[in-house]
Amino acid sequence: MRILIVRLSAMGDVIHALPALTDLRRALPDAHITMAVDERFADIVRLHSGVDRVMAIALKRWKGQPTAMQTWREIKAALHALRQQRYDLALDLHGLNKSAALIWLARAGLKIGPHPSLCGEWLASKACERHGLPEQAHLPVPRMRGLLALALKQELGGPADFGLRHAWQGAASKDVVLLHGTSAAHKLWPESHWIETGCFLIAQGLRPVLAWGSAAEHERAVRLAQAMGPQAVVAPPCSILQWAEQLARCRLVIGVDTGLTHLAAASAVPCIALFVGTSARLFTPQEPRWARSLDGGGQSPAAEQVHTAAQELLAMS
């Protein structure tokens, strides 16, 4: 059986789709599974042992260079890769026009997508022949797992398993990765809280490692590290695969609602997730006992709350 799964972005949502892939592999161990994903997050899917083929789609880059010949060559190659084989099932886990376009173009015997009420764009529901409205549809992991269960007509229960290859091995490490950056300003935690937390960690004999992924985040990381003192370091530039390895080797992760925080939680790394402008209900760690989510209810969680949670997790590890 050949199955196409489409979940293009964003990073956290691609991570939240991984338990559905684990469910699919367990339900159909002999199936050939292809996943279409934004090229920026393709390496996340490659970390999952249950995917046979990753189809990297460069939509954002193509959109930025619409008249370039290279763009059109890549689009042609992507369409060929999509249509070169026939699928028994194509499943849209995204529910937007861009994912629906891939489902519509795919040569699949059955095309299933989210219920129209779950689709972010009106046309997105028109590409599929059947639609699913799973229970807990407002939460990403249960929604995508539930949609798969409805597609397979099977009960797929149990705890979410992200199926990532990197196992945590940082119990002896002194590094605590601080994920302060996010693409949405309403998710940011105050810099004063980061500085206070960095100083707290240093007092515990630990080393704050400040991650970054853009020029603005690098400037903030340098600024925070300087305020914390010489023990704090700014991380070098890293790919997603390099971050997956680094997170697996650190003692603890503290991060806002951003992709790498969800990657750490999905990898069973001890993790504190800070939810400022979003809901902690979105947080689904692989090992709940090694994770804490602090929801400020639209406000910033206090630094003291983070310190208490850090002490709890450090004592356990």
Spell out what each predicted region is:
Residues M1-S317:
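Catalytic machinery of carbohydrate-active enzymes
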